[in-house]
A protein has these predicted regions:
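Short beta-strand or tight-loop elements
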Residues: 102, 132, 153
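Structural signature of FAD isoalloxazine-binding scaffolds in flavoprotein oxidoreductases
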Residues: 12, 19-24, 51-69, 119-149, ...
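Oxyanion-binding "anion nests"
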Residues: 176-178
Length: 178
């Protein structure tokens, strides 16, 4: 898998093992195998804010872009939605706007994914992806699914708890008030 042809900034080497699971169940199978074999791995999404070295790369990469559903939960007192981590931020932003809500218009130009945006607390024009987040669904370092509440995520400028704790962000619940 040639990263220089897929990354946002058109650089990076050739990944020998590129894994693109289509479901949480498949992610768990992949993690079980890699952990049993004591193989390190990288999680990637849109490869838009990541610089990866040139040359051949032996470490497996797990791409979560196939987790790409947005689900409207209800409209009671505002818009409640769930987004998978592989949804692109522009698609997410447009979805919220098309539902008649604001708060994401400044995010439209960010080329990343929801998972990466949560990981780094992405923002643009004073719109933070995480400002309307309620909870995040992750697979923790023990391979258990876990809910992380917004307060627990310790969001700050370009930072979150996920940068210091090995978790895989699967998706998040958002609320946009009327």
């Amino acid at each position: 898998f040639d990263l220089s042809k897929r990354s946002w900034i058109k650089c990076g080497g050739v990944i020998k093992t590129f894994i693109k699971p289509r479901s949480v169940k498949e992610i768990n199978y992949v993690l079980l195998y890699l952990n049993q074999k004591n193989i390190n791995y990288y999680i990637i999404g849109n490869i838009s804010n990541t610089i990866i070295r040139d040359g051949e790369i032996n470490t497996p990469f797990i791409n979560l872009n196939s987790l790409s559903k947005i689900k409207k939960l209800n409209n009671k007192n505002g818009l409640h939605i769930y987004s998978d981590s592989g949804v692109s931020i522009p698609v997410f932003s447009k979805y919220v706007i098309n539902q008649g809500y604001s708060g994401t218009q400044g995010l439209y130009g960010i080329p990343g994914s929801i998972g990466g945006g949560i990981f780094m607390n992405a923002s643009s024009f004073k719109n933070y992806l995480t400002q309307n987040i309620r909870k995040i669904i992750v697979i923790d370092s023990n391979q258990k699914m876990k809910i992380v509440r917004k307060k627990e995520a310790n969001f700050s400028w370009r930072n979150s708890i996920f940068q210091s704790h090995k978790s895989i962000i699967l998706g998040a619940y958002f609320y946009f008030p009327i």
